[in-house]
């Protein structure tokens, strides 16, 4: 095998794309800061039990594992940053009241989570801890929309669901993990035949409600249909009211609902959202409420958050036009170096042309040059 061949779904990022990624990273972190989020930088590697505690089987399967040569303990390379941020909130900061944290860094996956995806996403995320009200859910949605706007993503659709609906329908039913997994799969695939077979011994109301879920997707009219179809199930009306409240406050947004969507079922504890955009094969942003995420670290605080893969977003939006640069001659003279330093301090990109490479070009388009005119160094058009 050639030494330059990389593993499957791992790739080098070349200059043009790297510039786009870095510009977007800066823009997203600046946006989060404008909303009051503080930046944290968890390590890429942690003890395995810290990374996986309370996160479910899916994250376990996505996590690369290795043995620490110093301690002999099992380590993991993070596949998701949220558990680490929950640990920071619960154990290191240990603040009272609301805490807003954001992060941006690479994660590693043992398998790509969608066709043609990288196994090394650059994950950006933001978390709100300490508020159980819908105001925090709404803020996470608003921040997610603003992040996509900053990235240049247009024509988005927000899909809302709530994990509590299915949990209430399955409450009191004794199910093996295998059967529960099959029920989840049938709901996700909207397979009425399989779901009917798996729930044949359920109480009539629960079975009818589960089968009705398969048709409960679409615009806001779905919520009214759900009120009728699920009226015999205790506690459903407040959940639907919460979804209606959130949707009504997303001004100018196209909002849909899929009440059988169970992605993140083992993770989310309430409302969850996904934002789709034209040209993207999967959701660009996912988020929701996961109130139990910090319990394993000693603080069971309300929590809402969102995350996205910057590399995925970059793939669906055109890069910003690169600001034209200034070409300058390489030299040791103090006057030319002073002129170059002054231009760079003013925010200009100045590319020094090395001797013998005057005809070479790179990513930077130079529409001006630094030239000596009448003993002075001046910038003039090329």
Curated annotation (Swiss-Prot):
<dbReference type="InterPro" id="IPR004516">
    <property type="entry name" value="HisRS/HisZ"/>
</dbReference>
<comment type="pathway">
    <text>Amino-acid biosynthesis; L-histidine biosynthesis; L-histidine from 5-phospho-alpha-D-ribose 1-diphosphate: step 1/9.</text>
</comment>
<dbReference type="InterPro" id="IPR004517">
    <property type="entry name" value="HisZ"/>
</dbReference>
<dbReference type="GO" id="GO:0000105">
    <property type="term" value="P:L-histidine biosynthetic process"/>
</dbReference>
<protein>
    <recommendedName>
        <fullName>ATP phosphoribosyltransferase regulatory subunit</fullName>
    </recommendedName>
</protein>
<keyword id="KW-0028">Amino-acid biosynthesis</keyword>
<keyword id="KW-0963">Cytoplasm</keyword>
<comment type="subunit">
    <text>Heteromultimer composed of HisG and HisZ subunits.</text>
</comment>
<dbReference type="Pfam" id="PF13393">
    <property type="entry name" value="tRNA-synt_His"/>
</dbReference>
<dbReference type="InterPro" id="IPR045864">
    <property type="entry name" value="aa-tRNA-synth_II/BPL/LPL"/>
</dbReference>
<dbReference type="GO" id="GO:0006427">
    <property type="term" value="P:histidyl-tRNA aminoacylation"/>
</dbReference>
<comment type="function">
    <text>Required for the first step of histidine biosynthesis. May allow the feedback regulation of ATP phosphoribosyltransferase activity by histidine.</text>
</comment>
<dbReference type="InterPro" id="IPR041715">
    <property type="entry name" value="HisRS-like_core"/>
</dbReference>
<keyword id="KW-0368">Histidine biosynthesis</keyword>
<dbReference type="GO" id="GO:0005737">
    <property type="term" value="C:cytoplasm"/>
</dbReference>
<dbReference type="GO" id="GO:0004821">
    <property type="term" value="F:histidine-tRNA ligase activity"/>
</dbReference>
<comment type="similarity">
    <text>Belongs to the class-II aminoacyl-tRNA synthetase family. HisZ subfamily.</text>
</comment>
């Amino acid at each position: 095998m050639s030494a330059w061949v990389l593993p499957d779904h791992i790739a080098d990022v070349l200059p043009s794309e790297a510039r786009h990624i870095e510009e977007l990273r800066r823009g997203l972190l600046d946006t989060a800061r404008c909303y009051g989020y503080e930046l944290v930088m968890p390590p890429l590697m942690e003890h395995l039990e810290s990374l996986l505690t309370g996160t479910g089987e899916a994250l376990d399967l996505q996590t690369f594992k290795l043995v620490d040569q110093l301690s002999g303990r099992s380590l993991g390379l993070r596949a998701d940053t949220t558990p680490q941020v929950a640990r920071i909130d619960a154990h290191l900061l240990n603040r009272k009241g609301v805490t807003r944290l954001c992060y941006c860094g690479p994660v590693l996956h043992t398998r790509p989570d969608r066709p043609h995806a990288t196994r090394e996403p650059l994950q950006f995320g933001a978390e709100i801890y300490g508020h159980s009200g819908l105001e925090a859910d709404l803020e996470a949605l608003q921040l997610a929309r603003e992040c996509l706007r900053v990235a240049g993503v247009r024509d988005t659709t927000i899909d809302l669901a709530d994990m509590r609906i299915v949990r209430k329908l399955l409450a009191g039913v004794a199910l093996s993990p295998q059967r529960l997994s099959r029920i989840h799969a049938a709901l996700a695939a909207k397979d009425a035949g399989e779901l009917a077979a798996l729930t044949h011994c359920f109480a009539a109301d629960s079975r009818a409600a589960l089968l009705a879920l398969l048709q409960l997707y679409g615009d806001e009219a779905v919520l009214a249909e759900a009120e009728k179809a699920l009226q015999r199930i205790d506690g459903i009306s407040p959940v639907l009211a919460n979804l209606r409240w959130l949707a009504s406050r997303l001004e100018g947004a196209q909002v849909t609902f899929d009440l059988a969507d169970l992605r993140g079922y083992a993770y989310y504890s309430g409302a969850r959202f996904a934002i789709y955009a034209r040209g993207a094969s999967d959701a660009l942003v996912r988020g929701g409420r996961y109130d139990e995420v910090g319990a394993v670290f000693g603080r069971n605080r309300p929590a809402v958050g969102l995350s996205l893969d910057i590399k995925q977003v970059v793939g669906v939006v055109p890069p910003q036009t690169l600001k034209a640069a200034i070409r300058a001659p390489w030299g040791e003279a103090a006057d030319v170096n002073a002129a170059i330093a002054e231009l760079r301090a003013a925010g200009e990109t100045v590319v020094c042309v090395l001797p013998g490479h005057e005809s070479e070009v790179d990513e930077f388009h130079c529409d001006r040059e630094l030239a000596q005119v009448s003993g002075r160094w001046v910038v003039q058009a090329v």
